[in-house]
Structures are given as structure tokens and as C-alpha cells.
A protein has these predicted regions:
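Amphipathic/hydrophobic helical signal segments and adjacent flexible N-terminal regions
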Residues: 1-52, 60-71, 137, 147-150
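Hydrophobic core residues within well-ordered beta-strands of beta-rich domains
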Residues: 19, 73-75, 129
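Short hydrophobic/aromatic-rich beta-strand segments that constitute the beta-sheet cores
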Residues: 25, 53-57, 87-91, 110-114, ...
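A short, structured loop/turn motif at beta-sheet edges
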Residues: 45-52, 80-85, 103-110, 133-139
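Helix-adjacent hinge/juxtasegments
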Residues: 63-102
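Acidic, glycine-rich flexible loop segments
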Residues: 94-98, 105-130
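Mixed-charge, glycine-accented linear interaction segment located at domain edges/termini
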Residues: 120-151
Length: 151
């Protein structure tokens, strides 16, 4: 895998240098309590020279032609690299949920498991989750599975 280390990137983050940038794509979402849906997303990883990546993700529900119907979700967070290829990730959702994730990376392959979660009184309660990220054919691939609302 060939990539450029961004200027000023903290050395701890070199293994995640491939993630830095803006990624756009489309996907499909499913959950037992709602109808399946198609979405478009934009994911941004950037840095300010400190030992964490800033993370921002937003998505939109799209129609069959790929046109935006309405906003869907937003997340912000921070990604930290720890010894032994361990990641610690904090993510807050616009819906009132904040999660702590722990996982590992192996080159451009990342697996995270939800370690702890907080839900605001008006938010759904998320009890578990798994996130996978990877570089596939030059594109950011990700999958997000969650357990919430008793499902």
C-alpha cells in the first residue's frame, strides 16, 4: 500500500495516514425497526499536528436516482493510536449518543468494538456495536452494526 504521510502529521498517526482526507460514497442501511434505505455519505479525517485524528461524518437519505431526499445523520469524534496497533475512538452522534470504541488495525484494515456508550435521556439506547473500516480499491469501505432499541 503506497500513500503519502501528510505534512505535520503526528508520528503516532503514521499508521492511519491513509485515512486522512475527504471520502464520499453511497451505501445501504438496514435495521429491524425501520425500512431499508439508501444513503450518501461524506467522511472526513483531518489532523492539527496533535496525536489524534479529527473525524466528521454526515449522511443523507437518497432516492433511487441518487438524489438527496433529506439529511440522515452526523457524527464527530477523535481517533487515537495506542501501542500494539490498538485504536481508541470517541464518537458523538447528532441524535444524542456518545460512544467509546476500542479496536485494532492491521495496515488499512480496522475493526472497532463499542466499549462504552452514553445516551441522552431523549436518545435511543445503543447497547453494542462493531465498526469495520478498510481501504478497498482506493476507496474507504466501512460497515457499522449496532444493537439498540432491544434489537
Amino acid at each position: 500500500m503506497v500513500f503519502t504521510i501528510p505534512e505535520g502529521l503526528h508520528p503516532d498517526l503514521n499508521p492511519l495516514a491513509w485515512m486522512v482526507g475527504t471520502w464520499r460514497g453511497k451505501g445501504r442501511g438496514e435495521y429491524p425497526t425501520i425500512p431499508a434505505f439508501e444513503f450518501a455519505s461524506e467522511v472526513v479525517f483531518n489532523h492539527d499536528g496533535r496525536n489524534f485524528l479529527n473525524y466528521f461524518s454526515r449522511s443523507w437519505i437518497i432516492d433511487a436516482e441518487g438524489e438527496i431526499v433529506r439529511p440522515a445523520s452526523s457524527e464527530v469524534g477523535f481517533w487515537r493510536v495506542k501501542p500494539n496497533n490498538v485504536l481508541e475512538v470517541l464518537i458523538s452522534h447528532s441524535t444524542g449518543i456518545t460512544e467509546g470504541w476500542v479496536g485494532t488495525f492491521d495496515g488499512p484494515k480496522i475493526q472497532l468494538v463499542m466499549d462504552q456508550g452514553y445516551s441522552a435521556p431523549s436518545a435511543k439506547i445503543v447497547t453494542a456495536g462493531v465498526r469495520l473500516y478498510g481501504l478497498v480499491a482506493g476507496e474507504l469501505f466501512y460497515a457499522y452494526d449496532m444493537a439498540a432499541e432491544g434489537q
